[in-house]
Amino acid sequence: RRQRQMCIRDRETAAAALAFARQHLGAQPVSGLVFTHSHVDHFGGALGVLTAQDAKARSVPIVAPVGFMEEATSENVLLGPAMSRRAGFMYGSQLPRDARGVVDNGLGMAVAVGRIGILPPTVLIDQPTQALDIDGVRFVFHNVPGSEAPAEMVFELPDLRAFGAAELVSQTLHNLYTLRGAKVRDALAWSRYIDSALSLIHI
């Protein structure tokens, strides 16, 4: 949070997170949304923090990488039913849970099952590197398509010496070949994006 800004990532869960933040930071308006990539767990909570009417009335920037809507539609609408069935096996979601734990795939302990929604981007990041001011905060976005998601970007906040890696770097590299049937990623290209992030990000 800086003045009126809060960066919120990921409908019920997002609303609860925002309500919790406002208890401690004050009832500040959401002044921008950044969708780092086309996977539902990174945009599905949008309507929990911002309505379409409010976004339009206040001209709230909704930022996403080029190709975001096409890839979000392809994976979550066209292929969603089949991929959801397969994901049950991938995540072990039907396995028992108890006080001793739960079997998971190393990426997340559980998948949220609330309502999802989407807001169309108003700003597309279509250059390899692109700077943008969002309510007084300077962002520098770097496109990394075909890494963890078909449409993905990472960002740095140079004035705050911070870096948002989205899912470019994770200990599982879970989408090199995913059992749920998402597009297979190019491992070499993904590794090059990680190398580029190391050399380009000045924090």
Indicate residue ranges for each PLM-predicted region:
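Divalent metal-coordination and catalytic microenvironments
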Residues: H37, I62, I125, F155, ...
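Metallo-beta-lactamase
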Residues: G26, V63, M69-P145, A189-I194
